[in-house]
Amino acid sequence: MLDNMQFHSPAPEHPQLNGGINKIPASHKIGYKLNQQVQRLAVVRNNIEERLNSMESSHGQISDSSVVRAIDASIDDFLIPSPPLSPKLRQCPIISQPQLVNVESDHRELIMLTPVWEAGLNSQKYNHNTRNFLSQYSFFRDMKTTKRIPNKENRKLKVVKSVVNSEALPKRRRYDRKIKRRSRELYEDDGNRSENYDEESAQEVPVRSVTPIRQVKRSLHTISSPLASQGVVNNVPKYIPSMSWEKLPDYSPPLHTLPNSNNKVLKVEWKGSPMDLNHDPLKQRLHPAELVLAQILRLPCDLYLDSKRRFFLEKVHRFKKGLPFRRTDAQKACRIDVNKASRLFAAFEKVGWLQDKHFEKYL
């Protein structure tokens, strides 16, 4: 490398020709280099001639483009050096590893690798130290906002937000609150970081005794139209089997207004099998069409008579006050299911029992 630096140094021609490099005249060095270049050019010329001769023997006549390609290929072979040979793995004898003889494996003796902690340091404290260290960076700033405190009752981690200012706590008038703070201090002693966890240091907030205010709850009354026959119905507010129907006044239309030949004039649609009222002691007080209606709606004869008298009692009192009698009024007056009361309203309306001409005599 020193020879090349001396040979290519920017010195004038006269010192280069007269001087010497490593005690060898520079002119001899230049002649040696020129001789190498001439030999290389001769090799290139021989390669070109060989390629042209081989092409003439194979193709006969050679075109100019073929000559140019042959010259380019020879020059490329001269200028582009061939890559170095890949290293070869020499043959060496394979040495087998020595086998341990008469060694019995005992699985009962196991080696347990555990992390080495400093005195007083565990995994929880290590995680706490790491979070405090990372919280100094803006990217991990939110890692210190919550604390994980074990709950002794269910042994689960409970996330509790740290309270900084006690004045920001909500004021409750009827309850006394006691707030406990858990303080954790991190300090560094003699270059070794350690953590000091205080026991549950409870700080009680001064409690203000406040006289509780009694709140009177107002009962919400349902908005509904009162019964026009409320004064009369108060004497018999509930249905009493075989008794209540006799205590109610009877404003029902006469039974002769119903045809005797048609027992299905009051028939309505109802799901379920009809009730057998052939042995009811009060069936003689019902028209045959009414008996069919009571069987379909599964109403005993005394309950049917009670509902019928309450039905027309409300109709008469509303007629006296000049109020219309609607389906909802019938449902409120009867002490039976609202769907059955609606079927009674439909049946009585179908035969004309709700017409005002039947009740004009009570005005």
Curated annotation (Swiss-Prot):
Taxonomy, superkingdom: Eukaryota
Give the start-end ranges of region Disordered. 1-22, 186-208
Biased amino acid composition, Basic and acidic residues = 186-196
Q: Which GO terms describe its biological process?
A: ascospore formation; chromatin remodeling; regulation of transcription by RNA polymerase II
What upregulates this protein? By heat stress.
Task: List GO molecular-function terms, semicolon-separated.
Answer: chromatin binding; transcription coactivator activity
Supply one GO CC term from the record.
Rpd3L-Expanded complex
**Pfam annotation, one family:** SWIRM
Record's keyword terms, sorted: Stress response
Per UniProt, residues of the SWIRM domain are 266-363
Cross-referenced InterPro entries:
Homeodomain-like_sf, SWIRM, WH-like_DNA-bd_sf
PANTHER family associated with the record: SWIRM DOMAIN-CONTAINING PROTEIN FUN19-RELATED, TRANSCRIPTIONAL ADAPTOR 2 ADA2 -RELATED
What's the name of the protein?
Answer: SWIRM domain-containing protein YOR338W
Starting at the broadest rank, the lineage of the source organism is: Eukaryota, Fungi, Dikarya, Ascomycota, Saccharomycotina
